[in-house]
């Protein structure tokens, strides 16, 4: 009898010790599964396979924080976003647990990075995103301006008869030879350099202005560097913008700088809409000071010809912020963004992040291990959080089968994939994982 009592005492002590405590794993941090949200999209089929073993993934399909479900605002510790939603300080303050934001793309002007840093939120981007696509699209715009293919197509669609030499001269008026022309690039990062390589093949003389770039790059690419914006504008037959938008270069192209450009120069912008004062550009196009312009980005997006200062501007080509897009680029960007979120979860913020853009403003917050244990939602992977609750948005024709989840009072979204077994422990920063090993891209360096 005494022996039985002794065993009971031992079991009681063991139960008290283990109650509510996960067993320690020596090779990594101990923390619950965090909630990660894709803010302005509804397809997270690429992100889920990378994150599902250590995080709950939801998508919001929102265009503003007013459309984001309060569960995401209260519990999401990671967020991924495109360029179609803007996060100001006021918006960022609505997130109660947010630690990291990854912009799926290179630009981050739609996030107040200073406010984010002061709130302890790291902001990352994908600087290698869609470099080739953006460079190719830029060259297409430049060639279009010089060879006027868009206007020739429009003339034929409108029934213009083009048979005699005189008719050809009339309809193709303004077409120009490229060889020997000078292309000026404002900003000479990854995309600017890719444009320079392509432009040289067409016979352009290339020069650039970039006050942040170290000397020597121009020698390796066989281009010329100028050290003032005025010099670039004065010497260029075509000016193309390839810089980020910030408080220092808003409306970089304005009435004053346009007057410094060569008479009849071309302007191309596939960077950020806020770099160009569209009112000044429209006036310059009407007066002929600028011969033609091609814009992929605009001050107000989504862009419409029906409104705004450009609606009556001549010799203008506009595309809807699509210079970056290809299926391959989109896939690589999304994989890289999810991998950056994975680094944040398994490592330290901001030290473990590869592309943190607001370290100078960053304020350290509590470690991941103190996240509320109630914020564990393994059954909600791929759920839709959208205000008002209960509404699930599905694209026409449906999405690839990768969504599952429950919305309180709403419509369940399911798929026929096997249930994912979620491990209780995330790997340490130094422990290799199949996602970290297989999904790194050399061009992220």
UniProtKB/Swiss-Prot annotation:
Q: Which Pfam families match?
A: 2-Hacid_dh, 2-Hacid_dh_C
Cleavable signal peptide: none
Q: Which UniProt keywords apply?
A: Differentiation, Methylation, NAD, Nucleus, Oxidoreductase, Phosphoprotein, Repressor, Synapse, Transcription, Transcription regulation
> Which InterPro entries would you find in this protein's record?
CtBP, CTBP_dehydrogenase, D-isomer_2_OHA_DH_cat_dom, D-isomer_DH_CS, D-isomer_DH_NAD-bd, NAD(P)-bd_dom_sf
Binding residue positions for NAD(+): 106, 186-191, 210, 243-249, 270-272, 296, 321-324
Catalytic-site annotation from UniProt? 272, 301, 321
Residues modified as Asymmetric dimethylarginine: 22
SUPFAM superfamilies membership: Formate/glycerate dehydrogenase catalytic domain-like, NAD(P)-binding Rossmann-fold domains
Function of the protein: Corepressor targeting diverse transcription regulators. Functions in brown adipose tissue (BAT) differentiation. Isoform 2 probably acts as a scaffold for specialized synapses.
Name it. Answer: C-terminal-binding protein 2
Supply the source organism's classification: Eukaryota, Metazoa, Chordata, Craniata, Vertebrata
Name the gene that codes for it: CTBP2
């Amino acid at each position: 009898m005494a022996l039985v009592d002794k065993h009971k005492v031992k079991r009681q002590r063991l139960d008290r010790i283990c109650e509510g405590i996960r067993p320690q794993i020596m090779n990594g941090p101990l923390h619950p599964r965090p909630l990660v949200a894709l803010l302005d999209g509804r397809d997270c089929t690429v992100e889920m396979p990378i994150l599902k073993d250590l995080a709950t993934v939801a998508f919001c399909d929102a265009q503003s924080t007013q459309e984001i479900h309060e569960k995401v605002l209260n519990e999401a510790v990671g967020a991924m976003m495109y360029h179609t939603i803007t996060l100001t300080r006021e918006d960022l303050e609505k997130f109660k647990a947010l630690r990291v934001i990854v912009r799926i793309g290179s630009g981050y002007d739609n996030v107040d990075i200073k406010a984010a840093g002061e709130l302890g939120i790291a902001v990352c981007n994908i600087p290698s995103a869609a470099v080739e696509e953006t460079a190719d699209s830029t060259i297409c715009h430049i060639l279009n301006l010089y060879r006027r293919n868009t206007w020739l197509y429009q003339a034929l669609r409108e029934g213009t008869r083009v048979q005699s030499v005189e008719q050809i001269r009339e309809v193709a008026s303004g077409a120009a030879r490229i060889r020997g022309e000078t292309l000026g690039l404002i900003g000479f990062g990854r995309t600017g350099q890719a444009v320079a390589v392509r432009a040289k093949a067409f016979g352009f003389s290339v020069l650039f202005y970039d006050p942040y770039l170290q000397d020597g790059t121009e020698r390796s690419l066989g281009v010329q560097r100028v050290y003032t914006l005025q010099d670039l504008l004065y010497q260029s037959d075509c000016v193309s913008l390839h810089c980020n938008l910030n408080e220092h270069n808003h409306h970089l192209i304005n009435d004053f700088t346009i007057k410094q450009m060569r008479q009849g120069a071309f302007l191309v912008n596939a960077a950020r809409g806020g770099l160009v004062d569209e009112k000044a550009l429209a006036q310059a196009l009407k007066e002929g000071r600028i011969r033609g312009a091609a814009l992929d980005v605009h001050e107000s997006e989504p862009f419409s010809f029906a409104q705004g200062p450009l609606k009556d501007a001549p010799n203008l080509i506009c595309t809807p912020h699509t210079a970056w897009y290809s299926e391959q680029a989109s896939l690589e960007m999304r994989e890289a963004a999810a991998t950056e979120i994975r680094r944040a979860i398994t490592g330290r913020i901001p030290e473990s992040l590869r592309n943190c853009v607001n370290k100078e403003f960053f304020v350290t917050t509590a470690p991941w291990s103190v996240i509320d244990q109630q914020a564990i939602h393994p059954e909600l992977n791929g759920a839709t959080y959208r205000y008002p609750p209960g509404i699930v948005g599905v694209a026409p024709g449906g999405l690839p089968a990768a969504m599952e989840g429950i919305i309180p009072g709403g419509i369940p979204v399911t798929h026929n994939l096997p249930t994912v077994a979620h491990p209780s422990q995330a790997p340490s920063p130094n422990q290799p994982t199949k996602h970290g090993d297989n999904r790194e891209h050399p061009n992220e360096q």
